[in-house]
From Swiss-Prot:
Species in which this protein is naturally found: Pseudomonas aeruginosa (strain ATCC 15692 / DSM 22644 / CIP 104116 / JCM 14847 / LMG 12228 / 1C / PRS 101 / PAO1)
Protein name as annotated: HTH-type transcriptional regulator ArgR
GN (gene name): argR
Gene Ontology MF term list: DNA-binding transcription activator activity; DNA-binding transcription repressor activity; transcription cis-regulatory region binding
Signal peptide (UniProt feature, chain positions): none
Domain (HTH araC/xylS-type): residue spans on this chain: 214-312
Biological-process GO terms, alphabetical: positive regulation of DNA-templated transcription; regulation of arginine biosynthetic process; regulation of arginine catabolic process; regulation of DNA-templated transcription
Pfam families: HTH_18 (PF12833)
Coiled coil: none
Compositionally biased spans, kind Polar residues: 319-329
Assigned keywords, A-Z: Activator, DNA-binding, Transcription, Transcription regulation
Function (record text): ArgR could be a transcriptional activator of the dauBAR operon in response to the presence of L-Arg.
DNA-binding region in chain numbering: 231-252, 279-302
Region Disordered: start-end pairs: 307-329
C-alpha cells in the first residue's frame, strides 16, 4: 500500500518573495527525490487576493476551507501584513486549537503574533524588525536565532534560515542522514543549528580582523544611547587617541567619531521605519541631546529629515533599511 504524502501548507501574503518560497519548496522536493518515504506535498494557499511582486505571481489558490488539509502550516510573508481578515483569523485559531503544528517564515510571524498564537512561545525574529516586533508583541519570547521550534510552533527569521528550518524538519521526520543528503544536493556547506546567530561576525562586516578596531566598534554598538568620547573608547581598548584614529582611517576611511555618528544615525533610521516611537524618543535613544540636533545630523547624512524619511519610506516597505547617504566631496 502506497504511503500518503504529508501535506505541508504555505499560506502566502502578497509581499512574499520568490527566494523565501523557493527555499522551502526545494528542500521538500529534494527530500522526495532522495528518499522514497519522504513524501511531502506542498500546498500553496493565498491569504489575500493575488498580487504581482517584482515580476512574479504567487502560486496557489484561495485558502478558504483548505487549512485543515495540512498536517503542518507555515504563514509566509516578507513584509508585515496590515491585518488578518476576521475569517482567516478564526480559521487559524481553530486550526491551532486542534493541535496542528503552525509555523511562520520571515515576516509571517506578524499575523501569527497578531492572533495571539505566539504568546508564550519562542519565535525567531529577523534582526531588522526585532525592535518593532518586541514593542508590538511583548508576550512573544522573541529571539535573534536563525529559527525556533517551540512545541507546536516553528519560526524562521527569513533568508537562508528558511532552509535551515526545513532541514531541521526533515531531520526530525526522517533522520539526520536525509537532512545531510538534501544539504549536499543543494550545495549547502553545513547544516546550521537554530540557535546560531543571524548576523555575520563583526570582522566580516568591517572587512578587517584588527582586534583594536573590533573592540572599539563593539563598544560603540553597546553605547548608542549614551555615546562615549573618542578618548574614552581609546582608553577602553588600551591605545592612544591618535593610534585609534589611525586604525579607523586605515580600515574604515573615517575617524572614530564619524563612524560612531553614522552608526547611531543608521540605528535611528532603523527605529524610524520599524517602531512607532516618536522622533524625539528615537533621537534620545540614539544619543542626540535634542530634536534639532538629531534632525540636523540626520539631514546632513541622509539628505532628508527624520520625519520626511519616515513618511516617504513607510509609503513603501516598512522593512527597507538600506541607507543612501548624501554624496560627499
Amino acid at each position: 500500500m502506497t504511503a500518503q504524502p504529508q501535506r505541508i501548507g504555505f499560506l502566502l501574503w502578497p509581499a512574499t518573495r520568490a527566494l523565501t518560497l523557493s527555499l522551502a519548496e526545494e528542500a521538500l522536493r529534494a527530500a522526495r527525490r532522495l528518499h522514497p518515504e519522504a513524501l511531502y506535498e506542498p500546498l500553496f494557499l493565498l491569504a489575500e487576493a493575488p498580487a504581482e511582486e517584482e515580476g512574479w505571481r504567487l502560486p496557489g489558490t484561495a485558502w478558504n476551507g483548505r487549512l485543515e488539509q495540512c498536517s503542518r502550516l507555515f504563514l509566509v510573508a516578507d513584509e508585515a501584513p496590515a491585518a488578518v481578515s476576521p475569517a482567516l483569523g478564526l480559521a487559524l485559531k481553530q486550526l491551532a486549537r486542534s493541535g496542528a503544528a503552525i509555523g511562520a517564515l520571515s515576516a509571517g510571524i506578524y499575523p501569527l503574533a497578531q492572533l495571539g498564537l505566539l504568546d508564550g512561545y519562542r519565535a525567531a525574529v529577523h534582526w531588522r524588525w526585532h525592535d518593532d516586533f518586541t514593542e508590538r508583541f511583548p508576550k512573544v519570547i522573541a529571539t535573534n536565532h536563525l529559527f525556533e521550534w517551540d512545541r507546536d510552533r516553528m519560526t524562521a527569521c527569513g533568508g537562508m534560515a528558511v532552509l535551515d528550518l526545513l532541514l531541521a524538519l526533515l531531520s526530525r521526520d526522517h533522520g539526520a542522514e536525509l537532512a545531510g543528503a538534501v544539504s549536499e544536493e543543494l550545495v549547502v556547506e553545513r547544516i546550521r543549528e537554530g540557535n546560531e546567530r543571524q548576523r555575520i561576525p563583526l570582522k566580516n562586516r568591517l572587512g578587517s580582523s584588527h582586534p583594536k578596531l573590533t573592540q572599539a566598534v563593539l563598544l560603540m554598538e553597546a553605547n548608542i544611547e549614551e555615546p562615549l568620547t573618542t578618548d574614552e573608547i581609546a582608553q577602553h581598548v588600551c591605545v592612544s587617541r591618535r593610534q585609534l584614529e589611525r586604525i579607523f582611517k586605515q580600515y574604515l576611511n573615517r575617524v572614530p567619531s564619524q563612524y560612531y555618528l553614522e552608526l547611531r544615525l543608521n540605528r535611528a533610521r532603523q527605529m524610524l521605519m520599524q517602531t512607532s516611537k516618536s522622533i524625539i524618543q528615537i533621537g534620545l535613544s540614539c544619543g542626540f541631546s535634542s530634536g534639532p540636533h538629531f534632525s540636523s545630523a540626520y539631514r546632513n547624512f541622509f539628505g532628508v529629515t527624520p520625519r520626511e524619511d519616515r513618511n516617504q519610506r513607510r509609503g513603501g516597505s516598512a522593512f527597507e533599511t538600506t541607507f543612501t547617504p548624501v554624496e560627499r566631496g
